[in-house]
Swiss-Prot record:
Signal peptide: none
Post-translational modification (record): Contains four disulfide bonds.
Any one cellular-component term (Gene Ontology): extracellular region
Keywords linked to the UniProt accession: Antibiotic, Antimicrobial, Disulfide bond, Fungicide, Immunity, Innate immunity, Secreted
Pfam families noted in UniProt: Megourin
Protein purpose: Has antimicrobial activity against Gram-positive bacteria and fungi.
Name under which the protein is recorded: Megourin-1
Organism: Megoura viciae (Vetch aphid)
Amino acid sequence: YLDVKQLANYLLCIGNGQVFNGRKTCQIGCRAVCQQPGCSGYKECEQIPNIRLHKYRCHCNEA
């Protein structure tokens, strides 16, 4: 559940919630997209719980 501020942050920051294949790719790509306008820098890459896919979701810091 997202509050209004979190929702606004997700909408403003294009990097938030982007999905990457593999942890390293996510860390590199997420750091780049979290520098875009509306974002406040890289926070973390969260593994999406599916062992076979190795997909990671990008999270940027809240504005």
